[in-house]
């Protein structure tokens, strides 16, 4: 029996017959059904991955220009001057949390542009 014969035979089967065939093939070759991979287009898992808001930005080193860093931290966190200064002085410290990946990268870039070192976790 050639491959063309097999394909034409499968094409002529009903949905119920195809389901039975799949079940037999799974048993014969010891295959288990798996869920579709989350990286397939249109998958809800991919959309959920993009909407995750679990990123945190940490100030790891305040750098030499603390005034600029305090201004940057104050700008991105909307904290007062005293709170921003305390955050910068106590580095390493948490700057912001509950962020999307894009928001976290924006904050990290602003803080680093002021001369500090920051990281996204």
Swiss-Prot record:
Q: Which GO BP terms apply?
A: translation
Annotated GO MF terms: mRNA binding; structural constituent of ribosome
State the source organism's domain of life. Answer: Bacteria
Pfam families xrefs = Ribosomal_L12, Ribosomal_L12_N
UniProt key word Nucleotidyltransferase: no
A GO CC annotation recorded here is:
ribonucleoprotein complex
Assembly mode: Homodimer. Part of the ribosomal stalk of the 50S ribosomal subunit. Forms a multimeric L10(L12)X complex, where L10 forms an elongated spine to which 2 to 4 L12 dimers bind in a sequential fashion. Binds GTP-bound translation factors.
UniProt-recorded name of the protein = Large ribosomal subunit protein bL12
Q: Which organism is it from?
A: Tremblaya princeps
Gene (UniProt)? rplL
């Amino acid at each position: 029996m050639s491959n063309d014969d097999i394909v034409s035979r499968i094409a002529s089967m009903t949905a119920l017959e195809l389901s039975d065939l799949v079940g037999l093939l799974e048993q014969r070759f010891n295959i288990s059904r798996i869920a579709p991979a989350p990286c397939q287009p249109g998958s809800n898992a991919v959309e959920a991955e993009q909407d995750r808001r679990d990123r945190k930005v940490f100030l790891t080193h305040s750098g030499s220009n603390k005034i600029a860093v305090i201004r940057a931290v104050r700008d991105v966190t909307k904290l007062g001057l005293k709170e921003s200064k305390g955050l910068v002085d106590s580095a390493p410290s948490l700057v912001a949390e509950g962020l999307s990946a894009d928001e976290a990268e924006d904050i990290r870039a602003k803080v680093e542009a002021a001369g500090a070192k920051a990281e996204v976790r």
